[in-house]
Curated annotation (Swiss-Prot):
Protein name: Glutamate--tRNA ligase
Organism: Pyrococcus horikoshii (strain ATCC 700860 / DSM 12428 / JCM 9974 / NBRC 100139 / OT-3)
Keywords: Aminoacyl-tRNA synthetase, ATP-binding, Cytoplasm, Ligase, Nucleotide-binding, Protein biosynthesis
Subcellular location: Cytoplasm
Function: Catalyzes the attachment of glutamate to tRNA(Glu) in a two-step reaction: glutamate is first activated by ATP to form Glu-AMP and then transferred to the acceptor end of tRNA(Glu).
Single GO molecular function: ATP binding
Record field: catalytic activity: tRNA(Glu) + L-glutamate + ATP = L-glutamyl-tRNA(Glu) + AMP + diphosphate
Similarity-based family: Belongs to the class-I aminoacyl-tRNA synthetase family. Glutamate--tRNA ligase type 2 subfamily.
Length: 570
């Protein structure tokens, strides 16, 4: 039994499925699990597996794929068989052409992956049923969650980038007269009242299940107070409209919840100081969902209690409440999604802006080189699960890699370059495909001349020991003679087959290069790797490319000759 070949198969599969790095324990487990007769020889074979894993991890992803195709083509056939169309489950009470969904972001910050779940689900279901998708800006809190003009624009742009085109855009702040009309109707019906209790006093009564003294006063008195709220006779905090509910409800927050309150000098970006009575979220949302004909709502599990509050209004007016689908929170491991934390970080100078690549905003993911299709696929894969889901960056990277791999041209980027002088090598022009699977895209030409050094990365110093043989990728094989501030090497041969047979490591290189910086998000830090990019690399801003043996990057900007890229993933 060829242990080495079995280990190579599993190491390659593990590496390909996990960002280019095989996990030793996982490979050992696979080898011994598939071949239990090898267990008694574990001590003997683990060093063999370890050596194979190290070799596999030193290969570029393209080389790993090529090698696996050679030794185990069945893997790719099985992957094709396993592929099935992933989609969303059917919606309850949904009729073709009659489904209306909405996404209601607050324009007080850029929206993030967690918010994108509701947006994508709402849009995809409306599309699935040939219905209507509404973007409703929930912008009626000019005090605590203050809307800003820039975020209205950002949200529309981010939705467009995700491929989401609203059939209608609604601004809640344009609809205050509508909310006033319904508030007055509820007061006249005896289902709402104006409370002028100090907040602490009301809270004390509410928690004991005792009605506020204003609750059962005559409708005429309530309407008089309502007019005073509107005309400015009450100041901020002095009066609030409450919806009558069950004073014995187990959740005190549901008991006579506040529907409208006064905000003096709101200075709202759309309405200025025209209005001083503003609806709270549950009131405005309940009214709009009915008025706009919304049939299905996708809402985070943490907001489930909103439905309990809003149903009182629907019951009083005799309306049918939309079908509500609750889903869990979605987050990325180790990535900040909270708008308040992001805003604070930006204000303190910790983050560079709403598109800082360390963040989980849609803008940040876009800047980092994540494709909209990857985000959509991830959301649909997670679907309507009620439990919270924490996605690892590796999960998102795996989906994105599958999408960018066919489109990303390949280039050499040498981080922390050190010169290597090669003795005895002839002048040679290496012709390297821009993409190994797409010869029609052409080649890059890298010229080697004996009188000039090549540059290799300090990351590869562990491979460049005197006496070692390595292959300069797509160029030739060399023997390492001396390592210091520069490396001395001797030309050995051109043939790739010799390097393959002897399992010599592959090293990427450049001759003349243009300056390049790669910004790498690492937790709370941004690490900058400086180096050299192929001199004639024809890269453009926003292009996603693969720096071979380094990873996929998005070209962020070009300053003169210098290229600045942001690291996406392996």
């Amino acid at each position: 039994m060829d242990v080495e070949k079995i280990a190579l198969k599993h190491a390659l599969i593990n590496a390909i499925e996990h960002g280019g790095k095989a996990n030793l324990k996982a490979v050992i487990g696979k080898v011994l699990g598939e071949n239990p007769e090898l267990r008694p020889r574990a001590k003997e074979i683990i060093p063999i597996i370890n050596k194979v894993v190290e070799e596999v991890n030193s290969l570029a992803r393209d080389e790993q794929l090529e090698k696996l195709k050679d030794i185990y083509p069945e893997y790719f056939e099985k992957k094709e068989e396993k592929k099935e169309k992933k989609g969303l489950p059917l919606l309850p009470k949904a009729e073709k052409g009659k489904v209306v969904t909405r996404f209601a972001p607050n324009p007080d910050g850029a929206f993030h992956l967690g918010n994108a779940r509701a947006a994508i689900l709402s849009y995809e279901y409306a599309k699935m049923y040939g219905g209507k998708f509404i973007l409703r800006f929930d912008d009626t809190d000019p005090k605590v969650k203050r809307p800003e003009p820039i975020f209205y624009k950002m949200i529309i742009e981010d939705l467009e980038w995700l491929g989401i085109k609203p059939d209608e855009i609604v601004y809640a702040s344009d609809r205050l007269e509508i909310y006033y009309k319904y508030a007055e109707e509820l007061i006249k019906m005896g289902k709402a009242y104006v409370c002028t209790c100090p907040p602490e006093k009301f809270r004390e009564l509410r928690d004991k299940g005792i009605p506020c003294p204003h609750r059962d006063e005559p409708v005429e008195v309530q309407l008089e107070r309502w007019k005073k709220m509107l005309n400015g006779e009450y100041k901020e905090g002095e009066a609030v409209v409450r919806i009558k509910t069950d004073l014995n409800h187990p959740n005190p927050a549901v008991r006579d919840w506040p529907a409208l309150r006064i905000i003096d000098n709101p200075n709202h970006p759309r309405t200025g100081n025209k209005y001083r009575v503003w609806p709270l979220y549950n009131f405005a949302s309940a009214i709009d969902d009915h008025e706009l004909g919304v049939t299905h709502i996708f809402r985070g599990q943490e907001h489930a209690e909103n439905e309990t509050r809003q149903r009182y209004i629907y019951e009083y007016f005799g309306w049918e409440y939309p079908v509500t689908i609750h889903h869990g929170r979605l987050s990325i491991e180790g990535v900040v999604l909270s708008k308040s934390k992001t805003r604070k970080g930006i204000e303190e100078g910790k983050y560079l802006g709403w598109d800082d690549p360390r963040l989980g905003t849609i803008r940040a993911l876009r800047r980092r080189g994540i494709l909209p299709e990857a985000i959509k696929e991830l959301i649909i894969e997670v679907g309507l699960k009620k439990s919270d889901a924490t996605i690892s960056w590796e999960n998102l990277a795996a989906i994105n890699r599958k999408l960018v791999d066919p489109i990303a041209n390949r280039y050499f980027f040498v981080a922390d370059p050190i010169p290597m002088e090669v003795e005895g090598a002839p002048e040679f022009i290496a012709e390297i495909p821009l993409h190994p699977d797409h010869p029609e895209r052409g080649v890059r030409r890298l010229k080697f001349t004996p009188e000039r050094p090549v540059y290799v990365s300090k990351d590869d110093l562990n491979l460049l020991k005197p006496g070692n043989f390595v292959r300069l990728k797509d160029l030739f094989n060399v023997e390492i003679l001396e390592v210091g501030d520069k490396i001395r090497a001797r030309f050995y041969s051109f043939e790739y087959e010799i390097a393959k047979k002897n399992r010599w490591k592959m090293v990427h290189w450049v001759t003349e290069g243009r300056p390049c910086e790669v910004i790498i998000p690492e937790g709370d830090e941004l690490v900058v790797r400086k180096g050299l990019l192929e001199k004639d690399a024809k890269v453009q801003v926003n292009e996603i490319v693969q720096f071979e043996r380094f990873g996929f990057v998005r070209i962020d900007r070009i300053e003169g000759d210098k290229v600045i890229a942001i690291y996406a993933h392996k």
